[in-house]
Structure formats: structure tokens, C-alpha cells
Amino acid sequence: MEKFQGYLEFDGARQQSFLYPLFFREYIYVLAYDHGLNRLNRNRSIFVENSDYEKKYSSLIVKRLIWRMYEQNRLIIPTTDLHKNPVLGHTNHLYYQMISVLFAVIVEIPFSLSLGFSFEGKQIKKSYNLQSIHSLFPFLEDKLSHFNYVLDVLIPYPIHLEILVQTLRYRVKDASSLHFFRFCLYEYGNWKNFDIKKKCILNPRFFLFLYNSHICEYESIFFFLRKRSSHLRSIAYEVFFERILFYGKIHHFFKVFVNNFPATLGLLKDPFLHYVRYHGKNILATKDTPLLMNKWKFYFLNFWQCYFSVWFPSQKVNINQLSKDNLEFLGYLSSLRLNPLVVRSQMLENSFLIDNIRIKFDSKIPISSIIGSLAKDKFCNVLGHPISKATWTDSSDSDILNRFVRICRKISHYYSGSSKKKNLYRIKYILRLCCVKTLARKHKSTVRAFLKRLGSVLLEEFLTGEDQVLSLIFPRSYYASKRLYRVRIWYLDILYLHDLVNHE
């Protein structure tokens, strides 16, 4: 990146207005190859002429593309010619992929420069403990106990490509680049809509950039509506849908309500609304009444249909009551458990009973989802019955055992925060018996005979690491008792989800 820094240091007035000429600079293609494709897709590069090139950068194919872009008539090729000449069709599909990657790199330049200017002179404090996934659950345990409802919204897509082009138009002021981008999408892509699940495999950087810009556009408007939620019942928010004058209308809207309605600013505004985006979903936790939650639901429906022109069925917005329904988040099923508590109180000669309800945060393991992930990876069948791992029988005994022990410890480490360990013990049982069946299959023996010979050694391998961790946290007398069955342990060294946990 430092090698090309001199090429990218143009003044602030030009960096947003003249991105189109960068498509005709060879060094940008080198930058895209080194910084993008070599990192995201190491096994396959669209800047390589063929496999005999030993995956080296080809300047010849870049020169051909630039020459075609200068000669606009040569860049436009009828669809009939693509079918008649498969070599030409493949080449133009390759050109389209190159342009899409390059567009993502070029448009990221003003975003990265503006982000760097915003953090210039500021010191960002780093807390490695807060990087752990488990650090979120103490926050949920503290906050969710005060909430009643959770709004679970599935972010709708596919979305029409023209909406994405208009979204980029608000941030990239170069009309030539946007016209060229639209031309490439409709000329070579021939798509009617945008579906990241189907197309992200072809070009991850490009489609992730489009998806993130789409989400950024949505959240920028939603956060404004959330801050001004006290006015939504009386004022239609369709007036904000033209984003060219969006910020001016925000300022005008704020002045009108501050001057004319100062007493109603906090009537319907919810200060306890928490928002998170996870796995293509929006999750809103609040202490509102069912009536206000239904209002938020219809606001979401109208918002997506009016602004993004996407049909959004009401079934994709679920209102869950935390005391009855579970919130699926980061591999756990979280809910609130109401524990009735009876307290006997006595004043002088009179005694009476007081009924209290204690709200407790409950985190459970989604056993059906985990068994589905185990069945998908051939550790068991769909009913949860362990089977042998046939693809691992060619490995050594120690390698097979270490693989199972490592998976078992990681899952046990991640799900140590569950309220009840019954489902965790079931997962361990599946992995242990799968390990035994795999080793027995390798040695062409029965499970019973193999356990008689090496059963104690297998149990020691599976249990030693877990006992060492627990002995550092609790005294021996405590973790050997039944109380450990109900203790939740949150670790601060978990930075990513295991594949079996990340089942969605």
C-alpha cells in the first residue's frame, strides 16, 4: 500500500469527483491484485491469464481491458456474440470481474481517507478483554433483565440493483464512475436483483462492499428515526426519502419540533432501545408495551417497502416476549426465567407472606442446531446418534484423537456459560463415541472390544484439559460438587465462533 501512496494522494476536492480516470491506470490494477485478491481468494485470481502463468500478475490482460474501455464500441458486445464465441464470452466475463474488483478498490479510497481523517489526532483505547465474544453476555445479563420484548427483523434482500447505484450516488459524486458501474452491472451481469448469498462467492470483496453500503444507508436513516421516535406517530417520514436533501431536511425537522413542540419531545421516545445487527437480522430489545412494539413493526414494513422498493412480508418481523420466547444470539438461546419467591414477614404478632418474582437471565444451548451441524459434518445422524468419521480413518490414532479432543474442548469452552450443562454433556457424548467408532473402524474392530483395550486412555484425554481449567477457577471441593452444574463461566479469550457453533 505504501508503494502506491504517492499515486493516491490527490486533494480532497478531486478524490470524490474524479474517480473515473483511475480505471485507466495500470497501478490501480496492481494494487487491487496485491491488496484484495491475494488476501481474499488466494487459490484463484481473475488477474491471471491462465494456470500456466503460475498465478503471476498479467499486465497484458490489463492492457487489453484498458484498450477496450477506451474503445467503447469494442467493450459493448451483443449477447448473441457471446454464445457464438465461447472464448470471447469467457474473456468478457473475466473483464467484468476485473472491473467489479477494481470498482470496489477505487470506491473504498475516499471512504478510507475520510475515516483516517476522522481518527486523526485521536487515541483509541484498546481493551483485549472486550474483544471476546463472551464479554457481550454479562452485558445482556445486566440489560435484558429490565426489558420485556425483542423485535427480530430479517433484513430483506434481494434488492434491485438500481437502488444500490442510487445509494452509492449519495456518497460518490463522480457521475462518470457511477454510469460506468451501472453499465457493467447491466451489460455483463444481466441481473434483476441483488442476492449476496448467491453472488458473494464469485467476488467477495465487491459484493460485500455493496451489501455494507446498502446496510449503511438503511442504518443511517433508521438511527435518525430512532432518535426522533417521539414524532413518528404524527409526521410521515416519507419526506426524508430523497437523500440529496436529507441532511437539510433533518436540520429543518429538528428546528420545527424544538420550537413548536418542546413539551412532547420525550413522550414516546424510548431511551432503553438497544439495537444490534447479527447474521442478516436486526435485533431490537426494549421495555415498550405491545402496542408500541407493533408500531415499530409497521414502521419497518413501510420503511423497506417505500424507500427500498422491497416487498417485506410481516412474517419476517417477529415480536418475542423474553419471558416466553428465546432470543437466538451468538450460538446461545437467551431468555428470562421468572422464579417465584415467597418471603414470610412478621410484624409484632401478625405474620404474612409476600410473593416476589425474581427475574433471572437464562442462557441455553440450541441442541437441535448443534446436532444439525454435527450431522452435516458427519459426526452423527440427524437423530443425534454418533457415527464413525470415515474421512479421518487414514490418519494416525494420535491425530484422530487430538482432532476430537480439540473440537470437544473448544465447544466445552464456548458453551461454559450455559445455565444447564445437560445439552453440553450430550454433545460431548456424541463426540467421544464418534471418536471411538472412528478408531474402531480404522482397526477393523468392534466398539466394545476397542473400549476394553483403550477406554480409560480415551477418557483421560477428553477430561484432563477441562479439569485443569476448572481447577484454576474453582477450588477442588467446589467444582467436584453439583453446584458447578448451574454455574455460568464466561471466558475473555474467545475471539471467533467455532464452525459447529456458527451453524446459521
Curated annotation (Swiss-Prot):
Annotated GO biological process: mRNA processing; RNA splicing; tRNA processing
Pfam families: Intron_maturas2 (PF01348), MatK_N (PF01824)
Location, primary (coarse class): plastid
UniProt keyword annotation of Ligase present: no
Cellular component, GO annotation: chloroplast
Gene Ontology MF: a single term: RNA binding
InterPro entries in alphabetical order: Domain_X (IPR024937), Maturase_MatK (IPR002866), Maturase_MatK_N (IPR024942)
Subcellular location: Plastid, Chloroplast
Keyword Phosphoprotein in record: no
Top-level taxon in the UniProt lineage: Eukaryota
Keywords, sorted A to Z: Chloroplast, mRNA processing, Plastid, RNA-binding, tRNA processing
Known function: Usually encoded in the trnK tRNA gene intron. Probably assists in splicing its own and other chloroplast group II introns.
Homology family: Belongs to the intron maturase 2 family. MatK subfamily.
Protein name according to UniProt: Maturase K
Lineage per the UniProt record: Eukaryota, Viridiplantae, Streptophyta, Embryophyta, Tracheophyta
